[in-house]
Structure formats: structure tokens, C-alpha cells
Amino acid sequence: MDLLLGHNQFLGISHISEERSRERDKKFSDVKNIYKVVEKAVDLGYKGMILETHPRMLEFLKYYKNNETFQIDFYLQLPYIQGYIQKMNEQGLSGLILEIVRRGGIKTLSSTVLKNLINYVKKDYITMAISFLQFERAPFRDINIKAILLHNVVTDLLLSLRISSALEDYNIFVEEKMEIKPGFITLNFELFKKSFEDWNIKPHLVMTPINPGGYDMNPSSSAVETALRNYAGEVIAMNILGGGAFSPSVSCSYLKSFKNIEYCVIGASSNEHLKELIKLFKE
């Protein structure tokens, strides 16, 4: 069972206290501090890192490419849902489209082209969504992307609406056209497993909450546990400490009871925490 470094801690996210959240946000507003933590994680044996197109992570990525004193596999989580919602609220659909297209290296769009794009999105949103994946991935072309993980908001919405074609199109497109391993994030692993089996879709990778308290394990911890023990694919466990509710040793023992968990996501932000966790999981 290998460890992946999470990224929420670098965005100032803490489930323990608002004060800790503010401290993290201040510390990691300087991306050099993110770089130091990731560099130490690699030195200790962490195998990869979760990324998304949050502005701070894009800034970190630029710093990484300019320095690159270590090599690491990146797992890219797409799309950046929070940013999409914020941009839509502030500037509408046209503002969102411009933002995504600019990430792909296109600086300007004529009003006619933009209008045509908006009409296209409204008529064929699935095809356009897949095209946007390429724009979202554009800033990461020069680094080692091990997998693209479809955000749980999108995965679980499509599962609940039973839109199998969109999930299958994504799976095929990422693997065959982008030549990257496709993956999914879900907060309902039982539904994910059953639906993909019913639709005969073969997922390469799935990331889902797994922890001893059943935190975010839907529809229930027992249902997820049963589904996991009967699942043959690769699994990434996230939320393994339940936002700090469970001790690392208890979580580690629990996770090791499942034979098909390939990776665990660790939200560590200090050298001491990084060392403690890798020692536990490698024992």
C-alpha cells in the first residue's frame, strides 16, 4: 500500500479548526513552502500527489517546473468545481468558457466565436465537456500525469442520473486520446461498483473515502466494505483519518484489512507528520 500526498492542506483546508485553516492558508500562500513539503515526501517514499487546477496549485506547478529537484507522479483531479461555480456566478457561462480556453493557451476569442461556443455547449454539453478536459489538462503537459480523476461531484451526479454514456465516453477519451489512465472519484462506492458492472464499463482507478468511522462512506460503511471486498480494480483510499477524527494507527490497521487498496491519500503538511504516517503504513 503506497502513499499519495493530498493537496487540500496546501489550500488552507482543515477539518479540525478555523485557526489551523488560517495558519495553513498563510503558510502555503508561499508556494515554496508547498514545494518543500512535497520534496520531503518524495524523499521519504511517497509515490505521488493529488493536484487540481486551483490557482495556488498552478502557481506551485510553475515553481516545480522551474526547479524540479525531485520526480513525482501527479494525479490530476478535474474539473475544478469550486472555481467553475465561482466564475459562473461572477461572469456567467461566457466568463467560464473564456477562463478554460485561456488555460489551453488561447489568449483571446472574438465575440462571434465565443457566442458559437456558448451555443455549442448548450446543445452538446457532453462533447464539449470532454473537449474542456484537454484545456484543463493543458498546464500539466510538461509533467508526469499518472492519472486523471473525475471529480466526485460529476461522477456521482452522472451515476445518480444513470448517464452511462458520459462516463464511458470520458473513460475511453482519457485512455485513448489523452493516453493517460482514467479514474473516478466517488462518495458512493457501492453505487459506483454496481452501476459500472451493470453497464460493463471497466474503470482503471477509483478514489473513495475509506476510514474506520464510516466518514463519507455512502450509503453505509458496511455496504462500502462489502463492495470493496468484492471489487477487483485499483482503489485509492481518501479521507482516511476522517478529518482528524481517527488516529493514524487505527486508520492504518483498518485500511490494511482490505487487500485491493493500492494507495492512500495523506493530507500531511509537516515533516513530522509525513514521517509518522509512512512509518506506520510501511510496517
Put a short name on every predicted segment.
Residues 1-69, 254:
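N-terminal binding-site loop/beta-alpha segment at the start of enzyme catalytic domains
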Residues 31-38, 42-48, 52-56, 66-160:
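Active-site beta->alpha loop and helix N-cap motifs at the rims of alpha/beta catalytic domains
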Residues 61-66, 89-91, 277-281:
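Short, aromatic/basic amphipathic alpha-helical patches
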Residues 14-26, 119-125, 180-183, 208-215:
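Acidic/glycine-enriched edge-of-secondary-structure segments
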Residues 57-77, 203-207, 259-261:
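Short, electropositive alpha-helical surface patch
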Residues 4, 48-50, 149, 207, ...:
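Conserved beta-strand positions in the central sheet of alpha/beta enzyme cores
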Residues 56, 82, 137-146, 153-283:
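Beta/alpha (TIM)-barrel catalytic core signal, keyed to glycine-rich beta->alpha loops juxtaposed to Asp/Glu
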Residues 16-28, 87-88, 156-162, 215-219:
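Short, flexible/disordered intra-domain loops and linkers
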